[in-house]
Amino acid sequence: SAWYVPGGKSTTGRLYQDAGAAYVWAEDEHSGSIPLSFETVFDRGQDADFWLFKYNRQQDKTLTELKSDYASYAGFRAFQTGQVYGCNSGQVPFYTETPFHPERLVLEDLIRIFHPGVLPAGECRYFKRLEK
């Protein structure tokens, strides 16, 4: 199955860069999602400090569930350090709110994740760190 990662020129790719992240696909010229194999993503992203993804479920996903989905996920540094963040679109209004103000709504979450302590105290609106 394919992994879909945001291209470097996509809205999400640019938001990562605006939030001060060293996005591993920043140099990619695509303005949308890029379908890649797990092996390609792992080869390039295994040492990334953070792993963010979106999903839709009734309850939040955990690291244990993620590992049981595919054991190789545990090979990512972000998994090993607990820096995996999920946006459960079944629980938060990501797709209804962010198209109108991605720079304000999503960017704040990304800054909170990538640079804790920079913004005043508060919690992410869309992304949540996966629990064990």
Predicted features, each with a name:
Residues 48-49, 109, 119:
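Short, intrinsically disordered/low-complexity patches at protein termini
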Residues 64-67, 108-111, 128:
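Generic detector of well-ordered alpha-helical segments enriched in charged/polar residues
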Residues 114-132:
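Extracellular/periplasmic juxtamembrane helices and adjacent flexible linkers that interface
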